[in-house]
């Protein structure tokens, strides 16, 4: 089988995970990854066997650091069928003309606006809509986690209203530049947070608003989700619907915090402690009339990674059935 040629522009928190997940599939392969700085991440990418590309103006720095380059970012893009842009939020927009000039398909992550790609993706919610598309945005980690729970509930019970409060991890574990250290920060103060409108970019008919707070932790986000539905239901019904979703995992056996979830991922031998699934506490599912609540934790560094693989498969038309793609992606990465 000829594999789809995938480039990762921006080998950071998301990019390095996307590269490994793509490489684990049998219908796509990584032809290159990019960095701007010749630091430890660039050295490890080279050690792993990835061809490394950088802006032409930075090639001297890589040479000085003894990290070999395979070429410039433009040259990497020319070799690819599809580029996954994992540059920091707001940077990826400037790369669109480069992708258009090279005639390659492109995926952006949730730090970019919906309008840049014109299609926002979540595998369970709208896989088929991405079939054959040239430009797609995979929605952000929190938005992905919310789509994964709202879509199946809407399909089975009809969602009337969703209200969510998100406690957002302040920054990623490797990031030493950002805070907060001793504060809780409304993020943003002006409501709603971007997540509600972003859900509507995937599921336009859902009545949803969201509020988010940044808290001094790096491990995971935590959501308090409140949904009103159109159909009578019990906690067992909600439990059954969530159980049918392969990217939802129930937390039990003494797991009462995000710290223990990450320890579970370590104990399971997951790469980089990644927890690709929404982590829901079934005990928290509480129904009153047609309204219910629950808690879920979201591992921000990894949740969008299987979704990105599915987006590639849809855009390259390697699989027309979303459920089959989800199954294939999960199996290859060990989910
Ligand atoms: N981190 C998270 O929790 C999540 C992030 N996202 C989204 O994913 C995207 C990427 O975020 P994240 O992985 O955290 O970002 P990181 O800062 O961890 O990584 C960004 C990468 O892009 C590279 N880079 C920076 N500038 C350029 C450039 N001009 N051209 C090419 N490469 C560049 C950096 O390389 P170098 O260091 O060499 O400069 C780095 O490897 C954003 O849209 C973000 O919103 C989505 C879900 C979760
Ligand atoms: O996609 C994310 O969060 P989001 O879903 O709240 O936008 C990631 O955790 C990145 O968030 P950041 O913009 O705080 O680095």
Curated annotation (Swiss-Prot):
Sites where the protein binds D-glyceraldehyde 3-phosphate: 140-142, 171, 195-196
Enzyme Commission no: 1.2.1.59
SMART domains cross-referenced by the UniProt entry: Gp_dh_N
Subunit structure: Homotetramer.
Lineage, opening ranks: Archaea, Methanobacteriati, Methanobacteriota, Stenosarchaea group, Methanomicrobia
Protein name stated in the entry: Glyceraldehyde-3-phosphate dehydrogenase
UniProt keyword terms in alphabetical order: Cytoplasm, Glycolysis, NAD, NADP, Oxidoreductase
One MF term in the entry's GO annotations: glyceraldehyde-3-phosphate dehydrogenase (NAD+) (phosphorylating) activity
Catalytic residues in the record: 141
Pathway of action: Carbohydrate degradation; glycolysis; pyruvate from D-glyceraldehyde 3-phosphate: step 1/5
CC per GO annotation: cytoplasm
Subcellular location(s) of the protein: Cytoplasm
A Pfam family that the UniProt record links to this protein: Gp_dh_C
PROSITE patterns per the UniProt record, alphabetical: GAPDH
GO BP terms: glycolytic process; lysine biosynthetic process via diaminopimelate
CDD domains: GAPDH_II_C (cd18127), GAPDH_II_N (cd02278)
């Amino acid at each position: 089988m000829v594999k789809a040629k995938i480039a990762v522009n921006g080998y950071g928190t998301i990019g390095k995970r996307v590269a490994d997940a793509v490489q684990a599939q049998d219908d796509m392969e990584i032809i290159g990854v990019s960095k701007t700085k010749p630091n430890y991440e660039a050295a490890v990418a080279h050690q792993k066997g990835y061809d490394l590309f950088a802006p032409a103006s930075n090639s001297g720095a890589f040479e000085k650091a003894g990290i070999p380059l395979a070429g410039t970012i433009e040259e990497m893009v020319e070799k690819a069928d599809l580029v996954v842009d994992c540059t920091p939020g707001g940077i990826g927009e400037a790369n669109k003309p480069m992708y258009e000039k090279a005639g390659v398909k492109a995926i952006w992550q949730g730090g970019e606006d919906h309008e840049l790609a014109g299609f926002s993706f979540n595998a369970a919610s709208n896989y088929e809509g991405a079939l054959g598309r040239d430009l797609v945005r995979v929605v952000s980690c929190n938005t992905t986690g919310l789509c994964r729970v709202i879509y199946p509930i809407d399909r089975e019970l009809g969602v009337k209203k969703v209200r969510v409060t998100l406690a957002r991890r302040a920054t990623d574990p490797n990031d030493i530049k950002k805070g907060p250290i001793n504060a809780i920060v409304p993020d943003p103060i002006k409501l709603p947070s971007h997540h509600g409108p972003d859900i509507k970019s995937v599921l336009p008919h859902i009545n949803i608003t969201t509020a988010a707070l940044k808290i001094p932790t790096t491990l995971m986000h935590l959501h308090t989700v409140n949904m009103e539905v159109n159909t009578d239901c019990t906690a067992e019904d909600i439990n059954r619907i969530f159980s049918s979703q392969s990217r939802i995992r129930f937390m039990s056996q003494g797991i009462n915090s995000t710290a223990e979830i990450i320890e579970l991922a370590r104990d399971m031998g997951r790469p980089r402690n990644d927890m690709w699934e929404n982590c829901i506490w079934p005990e928290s599912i509480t129904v009153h009339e047609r309204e219910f609540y629950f808690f879920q934790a979201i591992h921000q560094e990894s949740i969008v990674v299987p979704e990105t693989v599915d987006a590639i498969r849809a855009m390259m038309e390697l699989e027309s059935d979303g459920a089959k793609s989800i199954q294939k992606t999960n199996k290859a990465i060990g989910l």
